[in-house]
Amino acid sequence: MERLLIVNADDFGLSKGQNYGIIEACRNGIVTSTTALVNGQAIDHAVQLSRDEPSLAIGMHFVLTMGKPLTAMPGLTRDGVLGKWIWQLAEEDALPLEEITQELASQYLRFIELFGRKPTHLDSHHHVHMFPQIFPIVARFAAEEGIALRADRQMVFDLPVNLRTTQGFSSAFYGEEISESLFLQVLDDSSHRGERSLEVMCHPAFIDNTIRQSAYCLPRLTELDVLTSASLKYAIAERGYRLGSYLDV
């Protein structure tokens, strides 16, 4: 049985090094999809690079934890910027959901302005769309706009009927122990669960000053090395997987 594999590189637009890494992993590796941060410091650079890579499917990486929002978000920003304090607000059930709804719509429109088309799908920076308070907002928006959504089905079960997503999602290809065997173990685990479609999240990048400031730095370069391995591409095909994007879901 043929299975669909979407290898999605997060953080398109974060930095030039991140952008170049994603393009390299698409051209010479197994990355088929990416998600862009429309408020990223290198988003214009990402748009420019994407014009020469029509095979790369591009979705939107909804941002609520970094940089400046596109709308006024007094309930979520501090000194005008977003940050990881969103976790504390979520724990206190004090998230400004109306502000988040408006920001989602604004980032979506900004994506269309930048890339000239709808995103293939939605996900989010630091997985904030999986917060139980935020997920219904994002799921409803994706369903209404007719675009797919990254959804970890181990965390949510109540999905809109017309929402497109994969049967499986994995964030396990991450950390200090990145290897081909780890990637293939993710696929094997998915196969054992009987999933016919799977998204694997990744973050391939070349190191630059912005990436050096990230808590997740050098493994991004290791990811790039693994994702451009010819032997990995062969092993994926051997397991009955077809590389694709959320347009195939």
Swiss-Prot record:
Q: Does the keyword Hydrolase apply?
A: yes
Q: Report which reactions are catalysed by this protein.
A: N,N'-diacetylchitobiose + H2O = N-acetyl-beta-D-glucosaminyl-(1->4)-D-glucosamine + acetate; diacetylchitobiose-6'-phosphate + H2O = N'-monoacetylchitobiose-6'-phosphate + acetate
Q: In which pathway does it act?
A: Glycan degradation; chitin degradation
Where is this gene product found? Cytoplasm
In the record, biological process GO terms are: chitin catabolic process; diacetylchitobiose catabolic process; polysaccharide catabolic process
Task: Enumerate the residues binding Mg(2+).
Answer: H61, H125
What cofactor is this protein dependent on? Mg(2+)
Question: Main location per UniProt?
Answer: cytoplasm
The entry's keywords: Carbohydrate metabolism, Chitin degradation, Cytoplasm, Hydrolase, Magnesium, Metal-binding, Polysaccharide degradation
- Which Enzyme Commission number(s) are listed? 3.5.1.105
Q: Which principal EC class is assigned to this enzyme?
A: hydrolase
What InterPro entries has UniProt attached to this entry?
Answer: COD_ChbG_bac, Glyco_hydro/deAcase_b/a-brl, YdjC-like
UniProt GO cellular component terms:
cytoplasm
Q: Which family does it belong to?
A: Belongs to the YdjC deacetylase family. ChbG subfamily.
Q: What is this protein called?
A: Chitooligosaccharide deacetylase
Organism of this sequence:
Escherichia coli O17:K52:H18 (strain UMN026 / ExPEC)
